[in-house]
Amino acid sequence: MVKIGIIGTGMLGEAVGLHLLDSGYSVSVYNRTKSKTKNLEEKGADVAELPSVVAESSDLIITCVKDADAVKQVLFGQGGVVSGKHDDMTVADMSTINPNAAKEISKKLHDEGIKSIEIPVMGGPNVAIDGKLVLMASGDKESFERFSK
């Protein structure tokens, strides 16, 4: 089964994580404020100390953080996803960022050999926990097909 990592467990990231756990997925999580991972940990998620640790154990990493700077930090900063990368890993960004930043981040991931999908969403935590978010995905077609099942 696919192993999923979630970086950013605020209201939306937590709701997505809870839905994935309820659906039987193996989930690991990271959040700067560790207390925001408590509900997910209680439901069975593994809590990582760094984004790189999430990357090491995940096939798909979902970022759900506050802005483009935060996305860049968790991906490319010290202890970021890139330092834990492995073959056949995909990053799916659900953060609310502008299209130019999304393109820049996608290019940097590609340069690192990491596949990426940008996934702006419509709907909030209540919709996410029920698995009914509206997703507008773009990016690596092979990864989209692999993880949309």
Each PLM stretch: what is its role?
Residues I4, I97-K149:
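Rossmann-fold dinucleotide-binding core
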Residues G17, E41, K72-F76, S148:
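A short local structural element in Rossmann-fold oxidoreductases
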Residues G10, K34, V65-A68, P99, ...:
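Alpha-helix N-cap/helix-start capping motif
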Residues M1-E56, L60-T63, M89, M94, ...:
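NAD(P)+-binding Rossmann beta1-loop-alpha1 motif at the extreme N-terminus of oxidoreductases
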Residues V16, K36, L50, A70, ...:
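Hydrophobic alpha-helical segments typical of transmembrane helices
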Residues E42-A45, I62-C64, L109, G131-L135:
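Short low-complexity, flexible loop/linker segments enriched in glycine and/or proline
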Residues P51-C64, A68-K115:
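Rossmann-fold NAD(P) dinucleotide-binding segment
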